[in-house]
Regions:
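Contiguous, well-folded functional domains in the mature portion of proteins
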Residues: 1-219
């Protein structure tokens, strides 16, 4: 089992504190911090995932449950072209690491301040704090995915930069304490999931294009 790099210092620090408390005789308090250490380790877990390696597919950028599938979204703040928006709600118990839904070149990374309403609320995608990424694949198709903060999750982590070449299934960030990730699929991609379905980042196929490009590697 791997852990997200953002968690190593926290896990190590709590582990040392737990050890010191036990050595000083504060065993009950040490036990409390031991439980806390296990909780933090679970929170930052980062299991390996096997991507389909087929660029006909757009894969899930987050673990969680599909809460919305909205057809023909256009003139949105993140996507001016018509798209299908798939919203994935991440509970505090889900893996919090986010993965790339497609290969290509990062066109833009945009952060927007906002509120911290519950991520499953209908207006969360419009009013909450969020970070959106646009990728252009080898055939010029644009895919947008947006990390949305929630009532508990108030820290968004994204390591991507404009101009960077990326590969489908790679880790690119996380949202502390879960929340929501929205994936904007081009209208020509056929949606393969349904509302209420559980999905896994880097593995679950969200949508499929009719044709396949040369391979799933960045151009």
């Amino acid at each position: 089992m791997h852990f997200a790099r953002e968690g190593y210092l926290r896990i190590f620090g709590l582990g040392i504190l737990c050890l010191v408390l036990n050595l000083l005789g504060f065993t009950k308090l040490g036990f409390v911090f031991l439980l806390l250490t296990f909780f933090i380790a679970y929170f930052f877990r980062d299991p390996d995932r096997v991507a389909p390696e087929d660029d006909r597919y757009l894969i899930a950028p987050a673990d969680g449950r599909v809460v919305t599938i909205e057809q023909n979204v256009s003139n949105d703040r993140w996507s001016t072209a018509p798209a299908t928006r798939v919203g994935i709600f991440m509970s505090p118990l889900d893996v919090h690491v986010n993965r790339l839904p497609a290969s290509g070149v990062v066109e833009s990374v945009r952060y927007q301040e906002g509120k911290f309403r519950p991520a499953f609320a209908e207006d969360a995608a419009q009013v909450n704090e969020q970070n959106g990424v646009t990728i252009q694949d080898a055939r010029g198709r644009r895919v947008v995915f947006v990390q949305v903060a929630g009532i508990l999750a108030r820290r968004i982590v994204c390591s991507l930069k404009g101009g960077e070449r990326v590969r489908q299934g790679e880790r690119y960030g996380m949202i502390m304490l879960g929340s929501r990730v929205d994936l904007y699929c081009p209208v020509e991609a056929q949606i393969k999931i349904r509302v209420g379905q559980a999905v896994k980042a880097g593995e679950t196929i969200i949508a499929e294009y009719a044709e396949r490009t040369s391979n799933a590697s960045p151009p």
